[in-house]
Amino acid sequence: MEDGTQVSTLERVIKEVQAPALSTPTDEMFWSPEDPSKPNLQFLKQHFYREGRLTEEQALWIIHAGTQILRSEPNLLEMDAPITVCGDVHGQYYDLMKLFEVGGDPSETRYLFLGDYVDRGYFSIECVLYLWALKIWYPNSLWLLRGNHECRHLTDYFTFKLECKHKYSERIYEACIESFCALPLAAVMNKQFLCIHGGLSPELHTLEDIKSIDRFREPPTHGLMCDILWADPLEEFGQEKTGDYFVHNSVRGCSYFFSYPAACAFLEKNNLLSIIRAHEAQDAGYRMYRKTRTTGFPSVMTIFSAPNYLDVYNNKAAVLKYENNVMNIRQFNCTPHPYWLPNFMDVFTWSLPFVGEKITDMLIAILNTCSKEELEDETPTSVSPSAPSPPLPMDVESSEFKRRAIKNKILAIGRLSRVFQVLREESERVTELKTAAGGRLPAGTLMLGAEGIKQAITNFEDARKVDLQNERLPPSHEEVIKRSEEERRAALERAQQEADNDTGLATVARRISMSAGSGRSRRQRDAARETREA
């Protein structure tokens, strides 16, 4: 190393970091010794912690077995206290393990998850497989609700589909989508609390309305099922300037904002105490909204269980524990996790544009060896302002033809350099956290690592504002592809135009082509003289 330290290539440099699990488990390892009909939870926990993967058959078994249990459950679950309620997980498997440390072992603690197990984080499939395995073991003490990200539209737009294809196959992804459609939509806890992922709807009057939904499908972009998954409380909840119960949700691009009067009216009509929901990142991991006038209890509570969301929010996570009519909030911080490049790229694919850009820059620098005096001596001859004559066919052996060919090659190198620059900027783009200005972090941020990102986004509110566009209902798959192709085409055209307008590059090309041309002319004159002398 630079400091003279000798490092063995046969050992891990940082020995305290556990090596990834490179092999898939045998059936003996996968099945539990206590109950051979169920997966080994302790093994799965450690195997996933080491970034291990299952065989496709083992993963499919967990998903299908979990789906059968979920499909047998009603739209609206009912459970008694004690229970621990958890919010969004978003593929943060290592923080999910911390959640179980804080909340209690699932074998001894009853859990209700409010959805959003996948997307944004890079360990979504591990979260699904482990939670579904827990559901297989504890079907009557661990419950899973559906979030807005448990659908084909969002998982295709964000990271989950790509993750499934990278770590397993599209077959696993399709099995997950089928399973997501079986997830229940809501729960009534202790006959007092309505637990849902999103919020209320103009079409939700009584709990019977939830029971009548056909949930076994892709969520629509409007209607009761959409609102349960997508709605939010108004930002000025409890201090509304309008008397409307529901306002179009401009942040999400679908569904509604619901007001304090709407929440109070629903709770009173259904004889409930509060609405417990997830769906929104919170700096402290939770938020208590204005209390109702009749009970003095918060009308709405938001729980968010993904700490340091996207590795930049710097937020705490929380779980809500309800026992003996006492409600406790337990917060926890993030846990270190393995790093993935954006979109699961490997380091060689990610670095190629950087290497290409530097090589072409070096080539141009090598070619650019002319002095200022040479440039002044080799300025192009002015052309008469008379009417231009039509271009004449050029002899491929002529000096002018070869001069132009060399010039075009130099310009092509310049264009290639600009293209590599565009590709390098594409590699630097953080697709999961786009800034409002141009959809990118400042150039070079990723090269600075975690510290660079921390400097670019300094606090929770900055991160939330930057990430708002990713909280919206995404465009269709076809529209995304079309937009991406248009952006790439425009970027490459801009790169070519910049290269064509680069006066320094044009000067280099002219100088080298003229030098080459004059060299050929000199050789031709020498050859002719030798012929005459002979």
Curated annotation (Swiss-Prot):
GO CC annotation: calcineurin complex; cytoplasm
Catalytic reactions of this protein: O-phospho-L-seryl-[protein] + H2O = L-seryl-[protein] + phosphate; O-phospho-L-threonyl-[protein] + H2O = L-threonyl-[protein] + phosphate
Binding locations of Fe cation: D88, H90, D116
Source species, domain of life: Eukaryota
Subunit structure: Composed of two components (A and B), the A component is the catalytic subunit and the B component confers calcium sensitivity.
UniProt remark on cofactor binding: Binds 1 Fe(3+) ion per subunit.
Keyword Zinc annotated: yes
Stated name of the protein: Serine/threonine-protein phosphatase 2B catalytic subunit
Gene3D superfamilies xref list: 3.60.21.10
Family the UniProt entry places it in: Belongs to the PPP phosphatase family. PP-2B subfamily.
